[in-house]
UniProtKB/Swiss-Prot annotation:
Annotated NAD(+) binding sites: G7, A8, A9, G10, G11, I12, G13, D34, N94, I117, T118, N119, M227
Subunit structure, interactors included: Homodimer.
Enzyme class, broadest EC rank: oxidoreductase
Species annotation: Escherichia coli (strain SE11)
Name of the featured protein: Malate dehydrogenase
EC number in record: 1.1.1.37
SUPFAM superfamilies: LDH C-terminal domain-like, NAD(P)-binding Rossmann-fold domains
PANTHER family cross-referenced by the UniProt entry: MALATE AND LACTATE DEHYDROGENASE, MALATE DEHYDROGENASE, MITOCHONDRIAL
Length: 312
């Protein structure tokens, strides 16, 4: 199993690479790519960690050597948020980066599963889909927007509020991956009940958690370490499913049946070919139903922006 991380010299990429080096199954290969010249050195640094995961680093304009034979490609390349910016302010720079990298993936490892981490995910996933479609290699079961950070934040905040062990809580999060499009389904957390006020406050905190980190870092970056952990969790789940493990479920932002929007984050059963089944979002509370209806315009606009970027 070969995993490639594109954008591996950045804050998310380095954290993700460290976690994959220590947690990928024995015998896996990990390849790191970034435009930054430091990247081969990041790989050398990580290569000193005693795990049976082979690692190589590549830098420069061409990601091809890193992508050859990759089964999973995780893309975290791009610029980070600064205070006062929201994820959509990143669009102008990051759209071009994602387009370029996905074009390279389409040529070198068209059958790989691709996880897009680069924000704004609502839009960058649509860009990736259109690029793959133009290249004639798009498989909607193999393209994912990584929204796992919303899930781990939800798990953490719910556990804190309710005095639970964080590892015991699993909150499904649907919709998209920015602002109002992030919808934690708090009504579906087993064995926990919330007041209306708690639901309103928690939902807002989960939606704004990225901004909380950006402000706390005082201009020195955005959520890189927790995002690295979230991306590793998703990447490792994908690897386990590709290797034949049964019953692996993760939420991610994928193209589905278009019931709500062309791309939508929902629980997915993962399998040997990527998405095996798009699971139902279940029964929503009145609050959640309202929030779902209220986000769809924003989500659809985000998606259209990505489609137009490639097709203009």
């Amino acid at each position: 199993m070969k995993v490639a991380v594109l954008g591996a010299a950045g804050g998310i990429g380095q954290a993700l690479a460290l976690l994959l080096k220590t947690q990928l199954p024995s015998g896996s290969e990990l390849s790191l790519y970034d435009i930054a010249p430091v990247t081969p050195g990041v790989a050398v640094d990580l290569s000193h960690i005693p795990t049976a995961v082979k690692i190589k680093g590549f830098s420069g304009e061409d990601a091809t050597p890193a992508l050859e034979g990759a089964d999973v490609v995780l893309i975290s390349a791009g610029v980070a948020r600064k205070p006062g910016m929201d994820r959509s302010d990143l669009f102008n720079v990051n759209a071009g980066i994602v387009k370029n990298l996905v074009q390279q993936v389409s040529k070198t490892c068209p059958k790989a599963c691709i996880g897009i981490i680069t924000n704004p995910v609502n839009t960058t996933v649509a860009i990736a889909a259109e690029v793959l479609k133009k290249a004639g290699v798009y498989d909607k079961n193999k393209l994912f927007g990584v929204t796992t950070l919303d899930i781990i934040r939800s798990n953490t905040f719910v556990a804190e509020l309710k005095g639970k062990q964080p590892g015991e809580v699993e909150v499904p999060v649907i919709g998209g991956h920015s602002g109002v499009t992030i919808l934690p389904l708090l009504s579906q957390v087993p064995g926990v009940s919330f007041t209306e006020q708690e639901v309103a406050d928690l939902t807002k905190r989960i939606q704004n958690a990225g901004t909380e980190v950006v402000e706390a870092k005082a201009g020195g970056g955005s959520a890189t370490l927790s995002m690295g952990q979230a991306a590793a969790r998703f990447g490792l789940s994908l690897v386990r499913a590709l290797q034949g493990e049964q019953g692996v479920v993760e939420c991610a932002y994928v193209e589905g049946d278009g019931q709500y929007a062309r791309f939508f984050s929902q629980p997915l059963l993962l399998g040997k070919n990527g998405v095996e089944e798009r699971k139902s979002i279940g029964t929503l509370s009145a609050f959640e139903q309202n929030a779902l209806e209220g986000m769809l315009d924003t989500l659809k606009k985000d998606i259209a922006l990505g489609e137009e970027f490639v097709n203009k």
